[in-house]
Amino acid sequence: MNPHPYLTLVRLGRRRLRSYADYLLFQRHQARMLSEYLEQHGVSLHGREVLDLGSGLGGYTMEWKALGGHVFALDLATSSPAIKAGRIPFVQANAHSLPFVDSTFDVVFCASLIEHVRGPELLLGEVYRVLRSGGICYLSFPPFYSFRGGHEFSPFHYLGERLALRLAQRDRDVPDWLRNHYEIRSSAQSFAETYDGWGLYRVTIRQARRLLKQTGFKVRHFGTRFLPVNLAAVPILGEILAWHVHMILETDA
């Protein structure tokens, strides 16, 4: 295993909140690492129709385009400056009702999104619908009971939602450039009410596997993101030990 990408990941991660440009560098490096992971499991983006679902600040989207994908971005928020500058097709929409006809895409990226939507089964059903026969979905999320499962509320999420919200508000120092994107509602009484139109919901590995089976997805690979050891595969304890789970899913050919 080449350690250099991981050392770079740590370095960029420490700097990511300095500016929007620094955050894009961090996201794009992660995307390159993920593209290598996908290639190892037989998934190439070059020349493929790709949907970046929950495109956010746009770093991943930019990299998928640079890797040769015909990329379409979708987010609940307005398009990011990076996506606009890259002239990447974008639509502002809800992931529960994707504005695409059936069998539109070869690959759908759904990274760190499923834990932010109410009704994850609706999201997965829509992803399956817009994928072509034999299509691929990259799905990732931090299991709720892991140390990163509470996102910006970690590690306070172990203490219950109301206390976690109060403690996170007290200790949270958000840079000005990011504040307009992800400002926590001061009136929020639960993780689900945290943001404007979306929140944080409890998603576990066990729940995700059950929903994927119900939806019809086959799991080509299942692992712990950016770690050579698959802690997510450890029964029960994987829910706590795996900081971030990722899966390569495929539809029926």
Q: Which residues does each PLM region occupy?
A:
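Conserved N-terminal segment of class I S-adenosyl-L-methionine
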Residues: 1-97, 109, 124, 201, ...
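Secondary-structure boundary/linker elements at domain or insertion junctions
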Residues: 81-82, 112, 177-179
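Helix-loop segment at the mouth of the active site in Rossmann-fold oxidoreductases
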Residues: 98-100, 117
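A short SAM/SAH-binding and catalytic strip from SAM-dependent methyltransferases
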Residues: 107-118
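S-adenosyl-L-methionine-dependent methyltransferase catalytic module, highlighting the catalytic core
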Residues: 118-122, 126, 136-252
